[in-house]
Amino acid sequence: MPYSHSHILQNAITPIKSHQKPNNINLIYHTTPHRGLQILYPVFTELCKKYPDIHLDVYSSFKIYGWEQRDEPFKPLFEELKKHPNITYHGSVSNGKIREALQKAHIFAYPSIWQETSCIALIEAMSAGCICVHPNYAALPETSGGWTSMYHWDEAPNIHANRFYAYLDGAVKHILQHGMPYMENQKFYTDTMYSWDKRSKEWEQFLGNFG
């Protein structure tokens, strides 16, 4: 189909209400496993040697799409996650549960290897006031609007993992030394840019062209 015959409308979310983060540092990964979970696990394991009190919540399964069979290649990784004392593997849960978890999370740890065209997981984490650590890959720079902790992506897994570790280390260190940074500007941008109020008006205008 010619590009001139298409029309792009961005994603939208219901903003996550303002809240206080808990004292213990929590990281979260809440997207499907093929997007970078295999990089996150060893990096987090290494990070725990330096920060033994951090915790990672993993909400990840193709079951959310009804494709549970696609979890098969990742089951050994899921088992490793379950064994780790600093990781809780939750599998697939409702978006309501994810939004609750984001309110308790300090860092969205997302070493993406997937060519996103947009990323609702990132948008919701930004709205929740999380420090979002991710590469400048595909549409993530556009989605984040420059408000996140973004590093240069590399196709080599070891290089990617090392850069991801460095940025995660910096985020954890900042929280320990200075407390959770002021994220209201990030939240304001996200809640304004990706609000349903804004997006519904765009849809009304778009659909009005066919009236």
Predicted regions and their residues:
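Donor nucleotide-sugar binding/catalytic pocket of nucleotide-sugar-dependent glycosyltransferases
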Residues: 1-18
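Conserved donor-binding/catalytic core segment of Leloir-type glycosyltransferases
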Residues: 19-36, 41-44, 48, 57
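Glycosyltransferase donor-sugar binding loop
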Residues: 55-74, 91
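Nucleotide-activated donor-binding/catalytic signature segment of Leloir-type glycosyltransferases, i.e.
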Residues: 70-96
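Acidic donor-binding loop of glycosyltransferase active sites
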Residues: 103-117, 130
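Short hydrophobic beta-strand element within catalytic cores of glycosyltransferases
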Residues: 131-134, 141
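A charged, aromatic-enriched C-terminal amphipathic alpha-helix characteristic of glycosyltransferases
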Residues: 155, 159, 176-211
